[in-house]
């Protein structure tokens, strides 16, 4: 039986209907259906046809048969690495990929090259290529604190992972065991649901031929750890708290940590783990004389022991070693460690601000590869995403350029859907460094919001970035939005009042232009709601009114934040929770 999937998209045949296409050229061929041929793929890979056809149908949701774009998917071993080539000619498209993940990424390239209209879609005869410049492109789903990744149902999580694969990302890092920080508030049903989603998530990553990496840990311990094993506290606030960390130099403490780690590894049994990542600080570390500097002494001694446990459980797994919050003392000893080891696949390097100077000034030891850790969620304002989209593409292009010459990829740290645009831009830069942030904004808009003026979209996002940071020096809650609208610089508040009003008008103009099928989608709503909220915050200098409260409640639904809101009402959590309650 042939594995052929047909998605019907209709051309309405009555007079007077104009089919609007975004950036459609004169040679663009018009279609209203797609027929996918997956005969050359394994049966377990045929779902790519459903992914591809569903994305077209969502944008051009019509219902009778007209011209059909025939698309064939196949794996071509003659292609290198994870590259793909897409040939479109005379109503037929062939997507060839070096491996299945490349086929999926190639499908994404074709989807983003199509011009979508209300009744038809079109694409000219063309040749497209997927040949990522940086080999490792991973997204880190922070599944904790009742955020979207923690609480989203399986179908939404799998859909989002599919999107990451269509963008050409090739790895996912996530938390598969229930997060210890949330366990004290969790019912047994919460843990069971989390485990079920974890299993589905891991299976989907494997089906998409992506790598799945998990935390290899550091010296963080369960809350019931023996008090006599407690680590000496960090003195640098950037490194986070380490109240629940163990000093491995205390007699009996190393054996305790190894037993805890064996238990964690046992919980991963049967899951398709292909990599692990060790982490030093935030949370982690010990400031005692035998462990300090932690990043170059206690940390590397500990992960040398851990990595053997993971090798036994997951032979050949990738090993990533983070250098988060390292100082020069950490780096000096860590470089000595790197020169004398043969097992680290990537070091993970970045900071809360600019890219660290040490690896830029000191060449990496021979054979060592570096990936960056763009902090795309938690910069410049708080709570994160609670007021709509976080879009800072220019910042992340600047950071990308700082490390472009030494990096082999990236790991994007994400706390939710609200920085989806940042994910797309940063991943796009690592795929193709010749692109710029504004180029990628236009690509995002053409695909996600067909019909809108892409240059207007670039201008719109520039204002979101320009008004993003809400820092007030010398105040207790220095990055809180609610603090900024009252105590921020008067002149800047007045300026934001004017530009945010104009930006809301621009959002409404774009919304009128874009296809009706995408106006209610969450990607547009988090951007539009940011514009609505900004306009209200700076025009009223108040955190609550009927317009704001309605916007916050819509975001609660988009973020699956209902449980997080309950926690806020009880006095805990709220890192990505819209400020629905009066006391937030």
Model-based region annotation:
Residues 4-14:
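Sec-dependent N-terminal signal peptides
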Residues 19-137:
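Contiguous, structured surface segment used for ligand recognition
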Residues 28-31, 133-148, 156, 175:
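Boundary/entry segment of secreted carbohydrate-active catalytic domains
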Residues 36-44, 94-97, 146-150, 188, ...:
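Second-shell loop/turn segments in exported
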Residues 47, 51, 55, 102-105, ...:
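Extracytoplasmic/secreted proteins, especially bacterial periplasmic and envelope-associated proteins
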Residues 115-120, 144, 170-172, 182-452, ...:
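Catalytic-core regions of glycoside hydrolase
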Residues 155-178:
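Catalytic domains of carbohydrate-active enzymes, especially glycoside hydrolases
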Residues 404-407, 417-419, 431-584:
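Catalytic domains of carbohydrate-active enzymes that cleave complex glycans
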């Amino acid at each position: 039986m042939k594995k052929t999937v047909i998605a019907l998209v209709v051309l309405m045949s009555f007079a007077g209907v104009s089919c609007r296409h975004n950036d459609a050229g004169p040679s663009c061929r018009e279609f209203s259906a797609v027929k996918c041929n997956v005969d050359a793929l394994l049966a377990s890979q045929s779902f790519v046809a459903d992914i591809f056809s569903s994305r077209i149908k969502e944008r051009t949701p019509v219902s009778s048969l007209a011209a059909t774009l025939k698309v064939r998917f196949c794996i071509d071993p003659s292609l290198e690495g994870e590259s793909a080539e897409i040939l479109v000619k005379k109503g037929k498209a062939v997507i060839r990929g070096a491996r299945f993940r490349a086929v999926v990424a190639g499908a994404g390239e074709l989807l983003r090259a199509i011009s979508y209209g209300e009744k038809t879609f079109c694409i000219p005869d063309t040749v497209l290529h997927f040949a990522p410049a940086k080999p490792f492109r991973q997204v880190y789903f922070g599944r904790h604190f009742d955020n979207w990744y923690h609480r989203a149902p399986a179908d939404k999580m799998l859909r989002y992972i599919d999107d990451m694969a269509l963008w050409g990302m090739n790895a996912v890092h996530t938390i598969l065991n229930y997060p210890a920080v949330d366990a004290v508030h969790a019912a047994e049903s919460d843990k069971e649901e989390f485990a079920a989603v974890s299993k589905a998530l891991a299976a989907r990553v494997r089906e998409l031929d992506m790598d799945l990496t998990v935390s290899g840990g550091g010296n963080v311990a369960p809350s019931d750890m023996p008090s006599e094993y407690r680590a000496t506290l960090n003195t640098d606030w950037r490194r986070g708290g380490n109240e629940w960390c163990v000093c491995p130099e205390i007699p009996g403490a190393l054996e305790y940590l190894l037993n805890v780690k064996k238990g964690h590894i046992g919980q991963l049994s049967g899951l398709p783990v292909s990599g692990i990542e060790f982490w030093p600080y935030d949370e982690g570390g010990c400031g005692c004389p035998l462990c300090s500097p932690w990043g170059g002494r206690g940390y590397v001694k500990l992960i040398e022991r851990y990595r053997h446990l993971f090798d036994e459980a997951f032979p050949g797994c990738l090993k990533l070693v983070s250098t988060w919050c390292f100082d020069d003392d950490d780096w000096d000893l860590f470089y000595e460690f790197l020169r004398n080891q043969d097992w680290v696949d990537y070091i993970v390097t970045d900071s809360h601000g600019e890219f660290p100077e040490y690896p830029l000034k000191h060449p990496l030891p021979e054979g060592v590869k570096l990936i960056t850790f763009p902090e795309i969620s938690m910069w410049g304002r708080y709570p994160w995403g609670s007021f709509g989209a976080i879009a800072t593409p220019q910042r992340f292009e600047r950071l990308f350029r700082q490390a472009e010459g030494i990096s082999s990829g990236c790991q994007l740290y994400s706390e939710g859907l609200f920085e989806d645009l940042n994910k797309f831009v940063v991943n796009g830069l690592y795929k193709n460094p010749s692109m710029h942030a504004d180029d990628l904004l236009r690509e995002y808009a053409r695909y996600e919001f067909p019909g809108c003026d892409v240059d207007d979209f670039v201008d719109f996002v520039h204002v979101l970035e320009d008004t993003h940071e809400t820092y007030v020096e010398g105040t207790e809650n220095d990055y809180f939005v609610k603090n900024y609208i009252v105590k921020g610089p008067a002149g800047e508040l007045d300026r934001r009042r004017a530009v945010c009003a104009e930006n809301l008008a621009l959002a409404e103009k774009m919304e009128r232009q874009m296809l009706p099928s995408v106006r209610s989608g969450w990607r547009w709503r988090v951007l539009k709601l940011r514009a609505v909220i900004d306009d209200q915050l700076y025009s009223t200098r108040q955190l609550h009114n009927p317009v704001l409260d309605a916007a916050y409640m819509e975001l609660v639904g988009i973020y699956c934040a209902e449980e997080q809101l309950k926690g806020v009402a009880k006095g805990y959590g709220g890192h990505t929770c819209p400020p629905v309650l009066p006391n937030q």
